């Protein structure tokens, strides 16, 4: 890290510290924490009330129902009333509260035009080009920097369901993960003629046979190899313009792919002036605190440090593709 970047980081951190120390922000944080905690409690109380009512009714019939109603009024109604006071007519779950109300303002301290939102606006068709074949795709939490390359990243979970029947004729359903990681979208510095897909492939240890769940060669595509033997073993390249593809796959880009082989499955799709990159990391960025204890520990400074580290990683990961 250069001295200039280090000074910039220190200035950012100091702005965050001053913001967190202000009485206005402390009040906002107190309300946000209370909203998130009451969302958790309300969900738990509703489940407990339903289960308790069923059990009491089964044991005591009408009397059990009356007991459940009394307990609900004593313990559940105050929580419901406070929830109505906090949210009024506006319904916000903890994902919205954490991502859009808590993290997004931090992003704006780093990138004034940046934002975070719960629902991504990535188009599904190009996303499928950089992910294994699947039937269900769930994207969440998009970070958009709105910088010169229009860099955005979202979490993605893709899966399919397998049904099986045992010897007794009982059917079970199992959810199989196809992809769990991040998808990046950015503007490619130059317009790309046609398109190129670079996707990972695995080989069995004995037969060296390709085992690939990513979409194979499509209509009008060519499959090409490079002079990098290691790259050919781990990646398949499909394109519609071989000249443009080979110009893109210069030694720097091939080295970047080789580096990422050991870290995660990485795929690229470029069409016209837009690039999509996927990383199968096995985790999601910006997970929402799921317990009351974690919510109580929310700190603007600490969340800034984690967010800044993620943004630095994202920028470093995509740096070679920027103009």
How would you name each of these model-derived features?
Residues 100, 104, 108-162, 170-323:
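Charged, low-complexity intrinsically disordered regions
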Residues 37-55:
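Transmembrane alpha-helical segments and their cytosolic interface motifs
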Residues 45, 56-71:
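Hydrophobic alpha-helical transmembrane segments
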Residues 82-94, 112, 163-174:
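Intrinsically disordered, low-complexity coil segments
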Residues 3-7, 20, 94, 98, ...:
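Alpha-helix boundary/N-cap detector
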């Amino acid at each position: 890290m250069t001295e200039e970047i280090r000074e910039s980081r220190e200035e950012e951190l100091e702005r965050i510290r001053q913001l967190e120390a202000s009485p206005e922000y402390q009040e906002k944080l107190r309300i946000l924490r209370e909203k998130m905690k009451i969302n958790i409690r309300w969900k738990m109380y509703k489940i407990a009330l339903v289960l308790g009512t069923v059990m009491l009714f089964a044991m005591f019939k009408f009397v059990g129902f009356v007991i459940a109603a009394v307990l609900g009024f004593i313990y559940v109604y105050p929580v419901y009333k406070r929830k109505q006071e906090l949210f009024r007519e506006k319904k916000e779950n903890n994902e919205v509260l954490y991502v859009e109300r808590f993290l997004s303002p931090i992003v704006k301290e780093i990138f004034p035009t940046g934002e975070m939102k719960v629902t991504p606006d990535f188009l599904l068709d190009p996303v499928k080009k950089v992910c294994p074949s699947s039937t269900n795709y769930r994207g969440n939490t998009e970070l958009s920097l709105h910088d010169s390359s229009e860099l955005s990243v979202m979490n993605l979970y893709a899966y399919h369901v397998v049904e099986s029947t045992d010897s007794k004729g009982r059917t079970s359903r199992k959810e199989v993960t196809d992809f769990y990681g991040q998808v990046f979208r950015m503007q490619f510095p130059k317009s790309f003629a046609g398109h190129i897909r670079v996707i990972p492939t695995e080989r069995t240890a004995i037969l060296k046979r390709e085992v690939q769940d990513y979409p194979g060669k499509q209509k009008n595509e060519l499959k090409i190899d490079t002079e990098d033997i290691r790259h050919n073993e781990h990646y398949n390249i499909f394109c519609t313009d071989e000249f443009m593809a080979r110009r893109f796959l210069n030694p720097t880009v091939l080295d970047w792919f080789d580096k990422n082989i050991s870290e995660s499955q990485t795929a690229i799709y470029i069409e016209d002036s837009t690039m999509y990159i996927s990383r199968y990391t096995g985790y999601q960025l910006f997970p929402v605190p799921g317990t009351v204890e974690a919510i109580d520990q929310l700190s603007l400074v600490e969340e800034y440090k984690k967010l800044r580290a993620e943004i630095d990683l994202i920028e470093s990961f995509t740096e070679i593709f920027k103009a």
